[in-house]
């Protein structure tokens, strides 16, 4: 084992980039190759069936089961021509990942042979065993039945030899056991509420779509080095490891030249993603060494979220092909930036209007201000819930660490927009600033054209920032299912818009002019939600104190933060809009607490294992070597001379003894803390115990281990060090 580290390091240096050959010269030629998109629907479905299915997708018309057989037959024909042999209902249980069970297309033909068969019944509904998925107590282990139901709004796709059908997943009694079902309900709610408000400005609007553009950050580590780190393999992050002398302090990795092996991985990933209609647009080095980002063009939120879940699965598969392992954990390495997944969120109408973009007319700008302010109202009223929607054991390491947004939800608007809202709040005038277009900036360099400057700057410390025509929710973790944040955000905004319309209509009913009524309600809301607006430094201690004075949620304990889901305001909002009922919310919190506990529990067990089987033996071995050196020196020199010459070694022997003793004591205390926590029946209280008593002991043990790493001879250290994990590419 002592030599494994050096073997994998040597092997990593020998690896060369793999050749990646695109299936065609232009990406547009293979985009959507493995997706049953509209073009393929048109080709493989009868015309009347095609038109009915498009009506379902575009207008939310209920699916007529009578067309299911024809749709299934068309899908099967296309899939079989592509060499597909199996199908699966692909869904997103409360595990943060995806789930699937593969069934073959074959059935008996009644003559002793087999035929390929796929019916509408199999397409529309399946019965996966729900007993082994997280349910938060909604289902008992012996109550196995659950239903997966086809989501026609998200295209069917092919992975290898399997036809994957995006579905929702519900219990036998109808409660949602997944992320997609409540997401679809939240998107419907914001569509209804936003459309109603839109008609004050554009009576012709029939539908509002929620758009999402995610930015997926990740680390790549050589597979050999990964295999020599049990903590990475089992927890997704390093539980120990001293900082590399060089990490990200030179700012030379961000937007730097992409390493050749990584470039080959990215190219391969993009090809496979494009074949699945994932519109990858951007790739680049991130701030930390061996950290990267991939981002697509924005899409409708449900499809964008499916694509993100699909891409994360694809990344793991392609990384292994190229001799890497992809790390999606929010904080795989201490001392350098963690990974997030910025969610760029916006609303747009079926007539092509971006609702969070300023316009050229007073009507456009009044609409713009309305949707900005009501978004802020939703975020302000439910800022604790939004924090709960993005919180996890992994993301808790990243938030508030002077590298990511703080664990206090606030919104950055920029000076121009903030001044506009202040102007509206304090003025009785109906005229609005013209926010259209961009200002020009001349650089006085003849070869460089005039730059167009956005009307807002960027504030990287803001968790929820306005960026010109959308809001960027930056607190979402890299490993998360975006649906969690999107459910909370869209529901909160839907509630705010619904309440806004109710109050405006009440004023209109009293005879007030529509514009006057809108401005009166906006003035009231601008004043109400002002505490959520913050354009300063979110990392400062002053902001924490200021946020408390403003009444914002400043809780930092992950298990306690989850309580916000069960606040009366949250329950009332989710129930009134038909997103989730109290029972479903309680169940999801049980799952969140249980997941948090198990994450920390696994980390604690792995730390104990590595500590006692790697760290302590290596440290004591080096200590014995030092002791032998001292003994040998005393054989050669006088006692006085030997003591003088061996003073440093004696000091190291003593330090190793003290640190290993603290480590061994720490591991014993860690085990005992786990035992005490495990006896707690309440999932909430157990999670709090793991947060308060188990996690801190792991940090204490890590501190001692990281000090030993600097003492023990490098040749004896068995675990790949940060300099190797982060700089071998």
Spans of features found by a protein language model:
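N-terminal hydrophobic targeting/anchoring segments and the immediately downstream early-domain regions
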Residues: 2-24, 141-157, 162
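Short linear, low-complexity motifs centered on an aromatic residue
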Residues: 96-113, 131, 229, 236-238, ...
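Active-site proximal loops enriched in glycine and acidic residues that flank catalytic Cys/His/Asp
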Residues: 67, 91, 119, 296-298, ...
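Active-site core of metal-dependent hydrolases
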Residues: 30-143
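Active-site-proximal loop/turn and secondary-structure-junction residues that shape catalytic pockets
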Residues: 67-71, 91-93, 121-122, 169, ...
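Glycine-rich, acidic/polar active-site loops that bind/position phosphate-bearing ligands
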Residues: 143-328, 337-340, 347-590
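Flexible inter-domain linker/hinge segments
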Residues: 7-8, 20-38, 42, 188, ...
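C-terminal amphipathic alpha-helical interaction region
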Residues: 524-729
């Amino acid at each position: 084992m002592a030599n494994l580290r050096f073997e994998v390091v040597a092997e990593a240096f020998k690896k060369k980039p793999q050749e990646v050959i695109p299936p065609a010269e232009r990406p547009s030629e293979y985009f959507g190759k493995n997706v049953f998109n509209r073009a393929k629907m048109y080709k493989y479905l009868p015309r009347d069936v095609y038109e009915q299915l498009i009506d379902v997708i575009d207008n939310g018309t209920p699916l007529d089961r009578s067309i299911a057989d024809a749709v299934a037959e068309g899908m099967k024909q296309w899939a079989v021509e592509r060499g597909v042999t199996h199908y699966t209902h692909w869904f997103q249980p409360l595990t943060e990942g995806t789930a699937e069970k593969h069934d073959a297309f074959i059935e008996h033909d009644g003559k002793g042979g087999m035929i390929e068969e796929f019916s509408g019944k199999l397409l529309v509904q399946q019965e996966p065993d729900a007993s082994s998925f997280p349910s938060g107590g909604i289902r008992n282990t012996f109550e196995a039945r659950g239903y997966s139901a086809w989501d026609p709004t998200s295209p069917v796709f092919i992975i290898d030899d399997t036809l994957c059908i995006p579905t929702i997943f519900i219990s036998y009694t109808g409660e949602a056991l997944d992320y997609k079902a409540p997401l679809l309900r939240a998107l419907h709610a914001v569509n209804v509420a936003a459309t109603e408000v839109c008609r004050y400005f554009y009576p012709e609007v029939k539908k509002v779509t929620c758009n999402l553009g995610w930015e997926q950050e990740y680390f790549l580590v050589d597979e050999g080095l990964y295999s020599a780190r049990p903590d990475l393999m089992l927890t997704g992050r390093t539980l120990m490891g001293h900082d590399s002398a060089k990490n990200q302090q030179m700012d030379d990795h961000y937007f730097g030249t992409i390493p050749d092996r990584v470039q080959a991985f990215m190219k391969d990933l993009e090809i496979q993603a494009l074949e699945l209609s994932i519109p990858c647009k951007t790739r680049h080095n991130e701030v930390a060494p061996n950290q990267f980002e991939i981002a697509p063009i924005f899409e409708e939120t449900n499809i964008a979220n499916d694509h993100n879940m699909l891409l994360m699965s694809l990344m793991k598969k392609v990384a292994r092909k190229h001799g890497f392992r992809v790390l999606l954990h929010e904080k795989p390495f201490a001392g350098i930036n963690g990974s997030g997944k910025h969610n760029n969120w916006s609303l747009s109408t079926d007539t092509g209007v971006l609702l969070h973009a300023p316009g050229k007319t007073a009507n456009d700008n009044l609409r713009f201000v309305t949707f900005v302010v009501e978004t802020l109202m939703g975020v302000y009223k439910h800022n604790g819930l939004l924090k709960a929607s993005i919180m996890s054991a992994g993301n808790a390491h990243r938030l508030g660490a002077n590298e990511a947004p703080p664990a206090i939800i606030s919104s950055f608007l920029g000076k121009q927009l903030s001044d506009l809202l202040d102007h509206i709040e304090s003025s009785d005038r109906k005229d609005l600033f013209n926010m259209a277009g961009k200002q020009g900036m001349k650089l006085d360099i003849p070869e460089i054209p005039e730059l167009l400057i956005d009307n807002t700057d960027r504030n990287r410390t803001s968790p929820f920032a306005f960026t010109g025509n959308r809001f960027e929710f930056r607190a979402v973790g890299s490993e998360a299912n975006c649906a969690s944040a999107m459910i909370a955000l869209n529901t909160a905004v839907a509630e705010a818009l619904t309440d806004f319309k109710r109050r405006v209509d009440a004023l209109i009913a009293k005879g007030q002019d529509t514009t006057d009524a809108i401005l009166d309600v906006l003035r009231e809301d601008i004043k109400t939600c002002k505490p959520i607006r913050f354009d300063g430094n979110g990392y400062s201690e002053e902001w924490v104190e200021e946020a408390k004075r403003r009444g914002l949620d400043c809780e930092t304990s992950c298990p306690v933060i989850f309580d916000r889901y069960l606040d009366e305001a949250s329950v009332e909002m989710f129930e009134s809009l038909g997103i989730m009922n109290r029972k479903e919310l309680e169940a999801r919190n049980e799952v969140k607490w249980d997941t948090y506990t198990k994450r920390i529990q696994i980390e604690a067990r792995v730390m104990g294992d590595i500590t006692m089987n790697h760290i302590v033996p290596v440290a004591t071995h080096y200590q014995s070597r030092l002791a032998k050196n001292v003994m040998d020196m005393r054989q050669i020199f006088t006692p006085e001379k030997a003591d003088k010459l061996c003073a440093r070694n004696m000091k190291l022997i003593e330090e190793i003894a003290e640190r290993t003793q603290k480590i061994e004591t720490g591991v014993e205390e860690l085990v005992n803390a786990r035992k005490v926590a495990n006896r707690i029946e309440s999932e909430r209280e157990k999670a709090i115990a793991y947060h308060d008593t188990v996690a801190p002991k792991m940090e204490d043990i890590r501190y001692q281990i990281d000090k030993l790493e600097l003492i023990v001879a490098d040749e004896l250290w068995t675990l790949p060090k940060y300099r190797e994990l982060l700089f071998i590419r």
